[in-house]
């Protein structure tokens, strides 16, 4: 009891956490000593460390939390158990615990759980005794920042802000306001249709490589190439002289006996030439 007498006083609510392996007689005697210390106005709640998450105590219930301080048996606290103890403590209240983790590790675990003012009270080869404190605010609470205060404008700030962004109808007849004429934003040259050759990329006019329209061509090269394909799509014979007449035709030319025609002219063969010889 001497080791915790400076933490417990009359009228306080104390959370006593014990673990499996501890002697029940020692736990009962220690609990009785705590109840004598807090008096009739205080309370002592005894909870097993493995059942903290199932306890019915709410947030900010206890003034002091004592964990694993009853007997020589000690265990390692998990991050969930430390967070549960922090939740049950009132703001700016202390916690005394013993743990089997190294001092640096248990200090880090307590910091991650939300404790502050962590100090190592005693340490030996197997256990470490640590004092920690819950911050002087509730978990999840909020506070207004000093620079977030609104600056007074000498009146109603909302009305002043609305007035700042309001354009009065009287402003349109004020001679001091320079209003841009929308007709001056576009010049006469902007209405002229541009020459397609001026819109064509330099790569389109390159003579070193085959002309090929770009994807989503907008300079007119795609339409020009398409029209050239239609113009140059005339039938061409293997010898290239069928249109000159029989004197220039091969012996197997299907145009034998037909008059000469113009290059590219569509010529219909007689039906007798389309029938197979028997």
Curated annotation (Swiss-Prot):
An MF annotation (GO) of this entry: 2 iron, 2 sulfur cluster binding
Record region (Fe-S binding site A): 204-219
Domain of life: Eukaryota
Record's keyword annotation contains Cytoplasm: yes
Major subcellular location class: cytoplasm
Domain notes: The C-terminal domain binds 2 Fe-S clusters but is otherwise mostly in an intrinsically disordered conformation. The N-terminal domain has structural similarity with S-adenosyl-L-methionine-dependent methyltransferases, but does not bind S-adenosyl-L-methionine. It is required for correct assembly of the 2 Fe-S clusters.
UniProt name for this protein: Anamorsin homolog
Species of provenance: Trichoplax adhaerens
